[in-house]
Structures are given as structure tokens and as C-alpha cells.
Amino acid sequence: QRGCGRSTPFLELKENNIFYSIEDMEKIRLHIGIDKWTIFAGSYGSTLGLTYAIHYPEKVKRMVLQGIFLANEDDVKWYFQKGISEIYPAEFKIFKDFIPKDEQDNLLEAYHKRFFSNDIKLRNEAIKIWSRFELRTMESEYTWPSEEEVQDYEISLALIEAHYFYNKMFWNDSEYILNRAEIIKDIPIQIAHGRFDLNTRVISAYKLSEKLNNCELIIVEGVGHSPFTKK
């Protein structure tokens, strides 16, 4: 993905949105010389994979997805405003209280503002709070890192997420995937989703599966978001 991991330039947000990403996928397919491929993806990867399939359905043989994330307005509000706050109240309080009270009605906007502040100390502290809140709520076994310095993976996680979510995924439709599911309804799709996934809600997987003709939805009891959970 552009701007993170081993991609260069690191943290580059110019020409960095989901539509550039699906074109990058298509370039890879053409470069390798694959006619039709299987898309295997989870979490935001499912968002990207589904968006790719909507644009290039004839190039997708089948899909194996985990942790469906539709990236709609409800998904973002659930995580960063009200929803998960009722399950992780102490962790959310740290996340919320970093922002002044007069800005707490829109925490995404408030954090986005700080991530792109010229005040590097403020920016890094905001990034640390955001990324560690997210990692802590992803799996209950996660422990808060002891490092005082913000890590590169935390910077890219926070800035790129906020860039996408603040700009509503660069879509012109909050329900971009569901409203275009007709295009991919006959592609063989298998979905595994943890019943207690608090990051990507099981309702999203269910709603998507209801719009598909050739979908197998497997709800895995007793697990959350991570595909590496031992059960």
C-alpha cells in the first residue's frame, strides 16, 4: 500500500487513495501475467479487495475474505466516536480525553487536524494515542507498548487511516460497496468473520452476504478480529 510498510516515499499522501490502490493491484496482475486471480484479504484488505472486484469483476476468479469492513459512515462512527466506547470505556476515555471538550463531537476531525499539525510534538502524541487505542481494542491480549518514541508503523497506521476516513474513502457514496454488490453477486466468495469482532462488525459481513448469490458466510464463534487467534 502506498505510503507505508516498504513503500517509498514513506507517508506520501499525494495520489494515495483507494482508487490508486486498485490500479496498483491491476498493474501487479498484468505484470505477473495472471488472467484471473483469487483475492485473499482481511479487514481493510477486504474493503480494497471488494472495491477492486467491483471495478474489475472479470478478473476475479474467487474471493476469500475475513473481517468485512465496509468503511461506511456507521463503521467509522462505531470505532472512533460511539460504539466500541461502550465495550472498552477506559481505553476510549484516554482516546477521547486527549481532545479538548469543544472538539469531542467529532474525534476523527480533531485527530486529523493534529496529525497534520506543524507542532511535531503534538502530532506525535496524537498518533501514539490513536494507534495504541486501536491496537489495544483489536485484541484483548495486546499490551500498551513501553516505548516513549512513536514508532514508524504507528505513524503510518494513524496518518493513512485518518487520511482515508476523513475523506470518506474518496468515495461519492457512503455505501459504495453494498450499493454496487450487484456487480460481484455471482463471484464465488467465502467470508469468515469472528462473532466478537469489534473492529469490523459482523453485521457488515451479514449485509454483504445477503446481496450475493454465490457467498458462503462463516461466523466463527468465540473469536474477535485477528485471524491468528487460536481456538
List PLM regions with ranges.
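A catalytic-pocket lid/entrance helix-loop region that shapes and gates access to the active site
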Residues: 58-110
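Conserved alpha/beta-hydrolase "acid-adjacent" motif
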Residues: 172, 198-204
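Short beta-strand/loop motif that positions the catalytic acidic residue
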Residues: 184-185, 191-193
